[in-house]
């Protein structure tokens, strides 16, 4: 068997360096070969490890999947095998395995691969079981099946990502590729004698001399970085207002360090007379499962008894209360210390609310890795933190892996393959001159060319998203590479630097039968904008139109505000018009700044989700820019209906929106007259005039005044008069705020608020009735 010699060299290398390896087995009859390789691994590694943890991952455990697993299982009874489906891979976050066996006959979902490979320990091997390596990129996977949306079929899938995946396996060290019929495709070239291989000792860890946490806690650390983070977080015991920013690549023990720190803090706080509340939040509870695991480990090591109320709440001696809540919910309680893990995945507005409310906050975030945020979070957020005058700011960057040694070829392979290490172009003053002169070209990415040729521009493009957007997952890039209904455009300076990127999805063009199903409860994959328009506004014809949904638009942060986003949108509009599309649109978490950007570029708000996103704390909105007369009529109708619904739903559904944002949402480029006449009774007119001429209070005519203002909002013709401080009227009439709340929010006295309202209503009254 010509693989054994190379396999022994691979084992030798990973043992010596505490690195990891991959063995790709191509072909159907791999069972004897794989069982032999596993036996060799077991016999050698059992000398270094007490227990060899093995994980088998498959798409399912029935039919052919089950047959392959059971046939292998009967040959390797010397290993205890844990089994899991790819879709459940979140369950293994924080765990560590020595052997990974991935059934990849029909599976290649990038997010899952990222999660799974990152659980592999040093001196560990991942086995990829592939049907046919030579024709790997021709294979259809379940990822492709999930991508499809009407009217596309499986044969429309592009499969460029699969080519990249295959190509990268051929490029990196510590990877063997073996075909059961053709033999070795990729070998290990370095000479290394397995019998002489022994693991390197771990670097010596130095504990701080003046440490406050117990040695029992510190000795749970695996790296110097973890020790340094614990030492840094001892400062939480000081009286100062403080913020900590801890950033790391994946697999650096960040969450474990936070858990150990909380256990160390708890031990010391138990000696105080005060009751303490410690809050923990993250985009999902799964992000902090490792934190809780190490919190409990630290408490147990310190012999501290605790009560586990739920997996999200721990109480220590009725004195220290530690709990997890979702990002938007945690603001409901005052905490002595707040831990925010994977902070980059939480809306910036919520993070700013934390800073207003809490005196001691720990923000941590992954920089690369499948849930990475890129450099932007640490760079931009740290810049903001440093501007705060009343907080002491601490920062630490964790770089040492806990599962394996640095310079691991498999980590390098993973980051490169999934484009996790992408960086955008650096910009300088000469670039800014080109931008000022609009010396740039806009074009659709030649996706196949970039993926097949490993063009550096691909990483520059992806790097913009990593730099400018908080949440980036490998699936997003694979979707762009493979999905038939996704494409991307870039704005490239004349010197070749990419400065802006737009990821789009083709939507609409839906047939009558599918539309009828959508009117009930059918939700077609993709087609986000047509689906919402059909379901919420019952306008069937819109789904027949063809449009482009902007999935993401991003500019390199240093040159934001120079008009590049607007320039790209203008160019995209022209491209869509030339190619006979009916509209371009987008769906995004609404903030004042973002909505202003879209409205400035002539996009019209037509929908607002009825619920906030629990992670970002924002309502999702849909904006559309019509391209032709037919779509213009529909968008105008949608905009009127949306404005009517918003006005009448605010006090019930959107009561937590700020007045300024509501006013922004009600802006429209269209001229409307309300669909009804304002017919007031004689009594209503009498009370209104009594209020405006002063003998009666606002309260005596509040119902009529509100009717007037709503009519005024709906009316957008040219003869509409302007009124001052309209946000105040929004607060009173649409949000139903008391004068006390208006006074507090707008920082004016109550009698002044009453004067403003009366003055503005008088303007509206004179316009309507005089």
Where are these regions (language model features)?
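N-terminal accessory nucleic-acid engagement/regulatory domains that precede
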Residues: 93-100, 105-199
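N-terminal pre-P-loop "Q-motif" helix
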Residues: 2-11, 218-242
């Amino acid at each position: 068997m010509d693989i054994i010699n190379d396999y022994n060299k691979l084992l030798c290398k990973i043992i010596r360096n505490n690195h990891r390896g991959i063995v790709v087995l191509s072909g159907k009859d791999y069972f004897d070969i794989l069982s032999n390789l596993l036996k060799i691994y077991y016999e050698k590694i059992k000398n270094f490890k007490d227990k060899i943890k093995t994980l088998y991952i498959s798409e399912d455990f029935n039919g052919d999947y089950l047959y392959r697993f059971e046939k292998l299982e009967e040959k390797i009874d010397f290993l205890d095998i844990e089994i899991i489906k790819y879709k459940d891979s979140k369950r293994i976050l924080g765990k560590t395995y020595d052997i990974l066996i991935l059934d990849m006959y029909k599976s290649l979902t990038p997010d899952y691969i990222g999660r799974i490979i990152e659980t592999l320990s040093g001196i560990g091997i991942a086995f990829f079981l592939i049907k046919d390596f030579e024709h790997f990129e021709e294979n259809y996977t379940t990822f492709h099946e999930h991508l499809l949306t009407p009217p596309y079929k499986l044969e429309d899938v592009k499969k460029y990502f699969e080519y990249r995946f295959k190509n990268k396996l051929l490029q990196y060290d510590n990877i063997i590729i073996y075909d059961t019929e053709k033999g070795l495709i990729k070998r290990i070239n370095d000479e290394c004698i397995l019998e002489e291989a022994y693991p390197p000792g771990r670097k010596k860890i130095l504990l701080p001399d003046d440490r406050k946490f117990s040695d029992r806690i510190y000795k749970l650390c695996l790296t110097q970085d973890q020790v340094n983070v614990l030492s840094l977080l001892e400062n939480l015991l000081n009286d100062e207002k403080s913020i900590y920013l801890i950033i790391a690549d994946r697999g650096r023990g960040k969450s474990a360090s936070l858990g150990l720190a909380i256990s160390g803090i708890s031990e010391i706080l138990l000696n105080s007379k005060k009751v303490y509340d410690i809050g923990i939040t993250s985009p999902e509870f799964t992000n902090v499962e490792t934190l809780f695991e190490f919190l409990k480990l630290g408490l147990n090591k310190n012999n501290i008894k605790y009560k586990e109320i739920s997996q999200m709440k721990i109480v220590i001696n009725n004195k220290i209360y530690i709990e997890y809540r979702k990002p938007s919910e945690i603001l409901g309680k005052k905490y002595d210390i707040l831990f925010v893990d994977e902070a980059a995945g939480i809306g910036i507005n919520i993070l700013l609310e934390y800073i207003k409310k809490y005196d001691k906050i720990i923000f941590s975030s992954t920089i690369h890795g499948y849930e990475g945020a890129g450099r932007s979070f640490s760079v931009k957020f740290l810049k903001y933190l440093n501007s705060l005058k009343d907080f002491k700011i601490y920062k630490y960057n964790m770089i040492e892996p806990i599962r394996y040694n640095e310079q691991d070829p498999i980590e390098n392979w993973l980051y490169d393959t999934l484009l996790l290490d992408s960086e955008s172009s650096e910009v300088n003053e000469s670039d800014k001159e080109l931008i000022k002169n609009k010396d740039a070209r806009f074009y659709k990415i030649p996706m196949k060319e970039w993926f097949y040729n490993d063009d550096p521009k691909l990483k520059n493009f992806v790097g913009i998203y990593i730099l400018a957007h908080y949440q980036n997952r490998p699936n997003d890039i694979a979707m762009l590479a493979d999905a038939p209904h996704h494409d991307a455009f870039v704005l490239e300076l004349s010197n070749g630097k990419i400065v802006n990127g737009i990821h789009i999805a083709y939507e609409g063009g839906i047939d009558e039968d599918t539309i009828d199903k959508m009117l009930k409860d059918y939700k077609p994959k993709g087609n986000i904008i047509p689906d919402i328009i059909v379901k919420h506004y019952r306008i069937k014809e819109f789904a027949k139109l063809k449009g482009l949904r902007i999935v993401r638009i991003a500019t390199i942060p240093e040159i934001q505000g120079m008009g590049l986003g607007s320039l790209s949108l203008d160019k995209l509009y022209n491209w869509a018009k030339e190619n006979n599309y009916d509209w371009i649109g987008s769906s995004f978490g609404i903030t004042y700044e973002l909505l202003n950007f879209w409205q400035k570029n002539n996009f019209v708000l037509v929908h607002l989700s009825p619920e906030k996103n629990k992670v970002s704390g924002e309502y999702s909105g849909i904006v559309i820019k019509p391209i032709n007369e037919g779509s213009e009529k529909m968008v105008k109708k949608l905009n009127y209906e949306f404005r009517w619904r918003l006005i009448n739903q605010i006090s019930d559904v959107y009561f937590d929106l700020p007045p300024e944002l509501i006013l922004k949402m009600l802006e429209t480029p269209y001229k409307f007259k309300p669909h009804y006449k304002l017919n007031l009774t004689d009594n209503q007119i009498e009370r209104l005039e009594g209020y405006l001429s002063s003998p009666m209070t606002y309260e005596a005519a509040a119902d009529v005044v509100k009717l007037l203002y709503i009519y005024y909002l709906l009316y957008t013709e040219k003869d509409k008069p302007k009124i001052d401080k309209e946000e105040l009227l929004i607060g009173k009439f649409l949000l139903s705020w008391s004068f006390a709340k208006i006074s507090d929010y707008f920082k004016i006295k109550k009698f002044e608020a009453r004067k403003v309202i009366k003055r503005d209503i008088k303007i509206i009254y004179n316009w309507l009735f005089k």
